[in-house]
Amino acid sequence: MIGRLRGIVLEKQPPLVLLETNGVGYEVHMPMTCFYELPDAGQEAVLFTHFVVREDAQLLYGFNDKQERALFRELIKVNGVGPKLALAILSGMSAQQFVSAIEREAIVSLVKLPGVGKKTAERLVVEMKDRFKGLNGDLFNQSSDINLPATAKQTTSDADSEAEAAAALVSLGYKPQEASRMVSKIAKPGADCETLIREALRAVL
């Protein structure tokens, strides 16, 4: 199992990052809350990974620390929650925000996440609440505010950034029309793709 990768960021296409390690490029799926913290292309990054083998694909999911990965692994143990839905959940909420929502039994907040209906939200609360006792460390000390790296630069047109952001939201489980509408509502001149995704996800919660 591939549990950790250290390498150079080659490409960032939310929610995917291409990381080169020893001449091999690894395509890694990341929750947007983790993706925001990646360095720019050409810089080194370290990711803690979870490897999934399916009949039709082998997939890597990446996280900034072990606590985030541990939360992802607990999520996919919940009945009806697979890696794709877990990724969407942790893209819409930071680890700390999700833990808080579960502890407060905030069903109303959880159902705003893509792919999470009332029954799934209730199941998450029931199955996850007691599991957090075994998860400790930075997971409970992270700020709920998500800040983009100061080095992030605008390199594409506004239209390209908006299209990229909408495509990323679709990959997280939102319907195309819904994703476009979410981006349109918060679009600002000069905003890059990552900023648009972050603001669109914040707006629905």
UniProtKB/Swiss-Prot annotation:
Gene3D superfamilies: 5' to 3' exonuclease, C-terminal subdomain, DNA helicase RuvA subunit, C-terminal domain, Nucleic acid-binding proteins
Region (Domain II): 65-143
Pfam families for this protein: HHH_5 (PF14520), RuvA_C (PF07499), RuvA_N (PF01330)
Molecular-function GO terms, alphabetical: ATP binding; four-way junction DNA binding; four-way junction helicase activity
Annotated region (Flexible linker), positions in chain: 144-156
Keywords per UniProt: Cytoplasm, DNA damage, DNA recombination, DNA repair, DNA-binding
Main localization (coarse): cytoplasm
GO terms under biological process: DNA recombination; DNA repair
Locations listed in the record: Cytoplasm
Chain positions covered by the region annotation Domain III: 157-205
Keyword Protein biosynthesis: no
A Gene Ontology term for the protein's cellular component: cytoplasm
Region feature (Domain I): 1-64
Family in the record: Belongs to the RuvA family.
Domain remark text: Has three domains with a flexible linker between the domains II and III and assumes an 'L' shape. Domain III is highly mobile and contacts RuvB.
Role played: The RuvA-RuvB-RuvC complex processes Holliday junction (HJ) DNA during genetic recombination and DNA repair, while the RuvA-RuvB complex plays an important role in the rescue of blocked DNA replication forks via replication fork reversal (RFR). RuvA specifically binds to HJ cruciform DNA, conferring on it an open structure. The RuvB hexamer acts as an ATP-dependent pump, pulling dsDNA into and through the RuvAB complex. HJ branch migration allows RuvC to scan DNA until it finds its consensus sequence, where it cleaves and resolves the cruciform DNA.
Complex and partners: Homotetramer. Forms an RuvA(8)-RuvB(12)-Holliday junction (HJ) complex. HJ DNA is sandwiched between 2 RuvA tetramers; dsDNA enters through RuvA and exits via RuvB. An RuvB hexamer assembles on each DNA strand where it exits the tetramer. Each RuvB hexamer is contacted by two RuvA subunits (via domain III) on 2 adjacent RuvB subunits; this complex drives branch migration. In the full resolvosome a probable DNA-RuvA(4)-RuvB(12)-RuvC(2) complex forms which resolves the HJ.
Record-given protein name: Holliday junction branch migration complex subunit RuvA
